[in-house]
A protein has these predicted regions:
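Sec-dependent N-terminal signal peptides
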Residues: 4-13
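Sec/Tat signal peptide C-region and signal peptidase I cleavage site
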Residues: 15-19
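Acidic, serine/threonine-rich low-complexity disordered tracts
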Residues: 20-104, 141-237
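Hydrophobic, well-structured mid-protein blocks that either form specific transmembrane helices
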Residues: 95-141
């Protein structure tokens, strides 16, 4: 369940396609862990700040477990640039806190993961563990079919690969939504985990659903309950 909360924080290489603009949104989700008699909720939002930066927030809770995640982002020349990233998990297993600053001037990512210092060289296009989800959402909306992101994970940098599977209709509490199914690409010899996401074909490409299957067969799902994009309610048919 802890990994599920982490992931729910936890959400295509066609050079000719321009990535989508940023659209402020807010969404709430139901969260279920199939092998356990419990359910939870999650909220995700993107808002524009007075200084032109953007704030991406995520909150999730399931019984006694909770998780919050916040990224402050610059959007410059069609590129997402993290400024800061905070993460806090409590109530289940080991508590965890992360605070990172992305300094474009010094080309450094500095901060702490719990008590461990972080000092990583900031490469072009590098993202945090929340901002990459927004990049994925934008790239899917732009029509890209496969993509890779370099993501700071504590003192390390990992590569996240994704591919588009195709269009599907998803039944939600706001109706049937035309969505695009995406999955994370992993080396099957290294991990049997399955991660699948459905993004709305329209309506800003908002995340509609997520499915995660762990190596032990446990399955975690979130499903859109309601949401807005550019102040307009997300609607299905």
């Amino acid at each position: 369940m802890r990994r599920a909360l982490l992931f729910a924080v936890a959400l295509f290489a066609l050079p000719a396609v321009q990535a989508a603009d940023l659209h402020p949104f807010s969404a709430s989700y139901t969260a279920d862990w199939k092998q356990l008699p419990m359910s939870g909720s999650a909220e995700r939002s993107l808002t524009k700040n007075d200084n032109g930066s953007w704030t991406l927030n995520f909150k999730a809770s399931m019984m006694i477990a909770s998780l919050t995640e916040t990224s402050v982002i610059l959007f410059d020349k069609d590129t997402l640039q993290p400024k800061s990233y905070t993460f806090e998990r409590g109530g289940l297993g080991k508590a965890k806190k992360i605070n990172l600053d992305f300094d474009q001037a010094t080309k450094k990512v500095t901060g702490f993961e719990n008590k461990d210092p972080v000092n990583v060289a900031l490469q072009s296009g590098m993202l945090d563990k929340s901002t990459y989800q927004l990049a994925l959402q934008r790239d899917v909306a732009a029509g890209k079919k496969s993509m890779s992101y370099n993501v700071v994970e504590g003192t390390d940098v990992d590569t996240y690969d994704f591919r588009v599977i195709g269009p599907e209709k998803v039944q939600t509490k706001v109706g049937s939504i035309d969505a695009i199914k995406v999955e994370r690409v992993r080396d099957p010899t290294q991990s049997k985990r399955i991660t699948q996401m459905w993004f709305a074909k329209d309506q800003g490409g908002i995340l509609v659903a997520l499915r995660q299957v762990e190596t032990d067969g446990k399955e975690y799902n979130i499903m859109l309950q309601d949401g807005t994009v550019d102040g307009k309610a997300v609607k299905g048919s």
